[in-house]
Amino acid sequence: MKKSFVKIISILLVLCMTLPIMASAMVAGEVSRVSVTINGDSATARGFCWYTDEKAGTDVQVAVVGADLTKAAIVSGVSYKAMEKYVHKAEVDTLKPNTRYQYRVGDSKTGVWSDVGYFTTPGKSKDEANFIVFADVQASNEENFQQAAKVLQSAVETMPNYEFAVGLGDFVNDCTNEEWDSYFRNFSFMNMNTTLVPVAGNHEGNLQWFKFNNMFNIGAAEDSMTVTGCYYSFDWGDAHFAVLNSNDMYPMSASQINWLKNDMNSSDAQWKIVLMHRALYSAGKNINKPDTVIMRNLLLPVIDELGIDVVFAGHDHMYMRTEPVKGEKVQVASTVTEYWNGESTTFALNPDGTTHILPSTAGTKRYGVNEDAMPPILESSALARDTKDGGVFATVSLDSNHFVYKAYMVDDETGEKSLIDTYAIKKTDRESINEDYEDLPTDIGSTVNQQGITLVIELLKMLVSYIKLLFSVI
């Protein structure tokens, strides 16, 4: 009896010592920071990224909604250590267009999986697209992440049929593990249940080398340097999107500009949209900074040349939308009012120019209007305002002839949503691909001379401008 008692006590002691270790191992294998992004053809491929605290398997299962996910094929990826954690990346390129999918990521050997997430692929036909746009969460504590998450929850409630979400950069403030954990924890309702289109912000790029690309699994352009982010493009519906990296070799590399020209000239989509972080048109505090001025001088002629319809940008934490502009001049367009999706909507008809939109910030760090912004900017604005009372999100719906944009502010105190701006475009014309266009070089070796010469010229231009300004003040 005494021996049996001692044996039982010994077993209990062993269990007491090993259970915490087992529990710790289970927690260590827990999946976090899950995101689904464009990686290849948007209709058939996705990139998955997630984190674990300890080394673990890198597996993903994807199945059509309604099928048994646990029986889906296991696709394995790669894992590496970064920021004292393990990054996991896997790609799936066998998806079907116009299909709703469920997925989970984790370790098939240990059976530690994430919660089930969802995403949708677009159709191959030129059908409608619906998406959410937000900018500059840039929080540094849990309270501010929670406040920004309320803004995006309102966005999802406003557009429950959204198919992807565009984040215009600066998801966090200092790129610490604590901030990224807080961001993904509070935004999991969106990040796990849609395709995210992330744009590299300066808070993920400046001296935060590789952190943007460690956080998302994106199909970057072939010659895109990934130190400070990346650039890439995709189609959705009858729209072609180019996602730029405004951290790229301040102010912007010749390689990236050449890529943008090649990319847009190869698309026959009705709508051509650019997504970037630092704005070309903004009444915010950063618009007169030298790097932004140079980038603006380099890119605006290209935007005009390519016939870009809309540019979405962030960075300045204030709200602004321009009239259609070309050559830094407002292009007046006629309007037509008609019912679209059950609403009476006034459309700008075939505008000859680009509309630049800066949808303020979804976060709590907000700035006012810079009255000293360059005259062409203030003169072109249809609306420029602060959003000090709440965070902002925007929705976009489009088809082959219509583009409808709406911006909302969510009050910090009441949580009530209010429509602060709306703009719509109707196109009855369609441009064909320029068959005579010849691709420009995009590799660094071929563009290094172009880069150096352009930078020197722009610096000299800026110096002359400052000298003129100085003499005008004296």
Give short role names for the model-derived ranges:
Residues A139-E143, V172-N177, N202-Q208, M249-M252, ...:
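Active-site environment of divalent metal-dependent phosphoester hydrolases
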Residues A82, K89-E91, R100-T120, N177-D268, ...:
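Extended active-site neighborhood of metal-dependent phosphoesterases/phosphodiesterases
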Residues S10, T18-V133, Q138, D389, ...:
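Acidic, histidine-bearing metal-coordination/catalytic regions of metal-dependent phosphoesterases
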Residues M1-M26, L455, L459-I474:
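Gram-positive cell-envelope targeting signals
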Residues Q270-V311, E323, K329-V332:
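Active-site-proximal segments of metal-dependent phosphoesterases and phosphodiesterases across multiple
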Residues Q146-N206, E305:
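Core catalytic region of metal-dependent phosphoesterases/phosphodiesterases
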Residues V133-A135, F164-D170, L196-N202, N245, ...:
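Active-site neighborhood of phospho(di)ester-bond hydrolases with catalytic His/Asp-centered motifs
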Residues V112-L168, N173:
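An acidic-aromatic substrate-binding cleft motif
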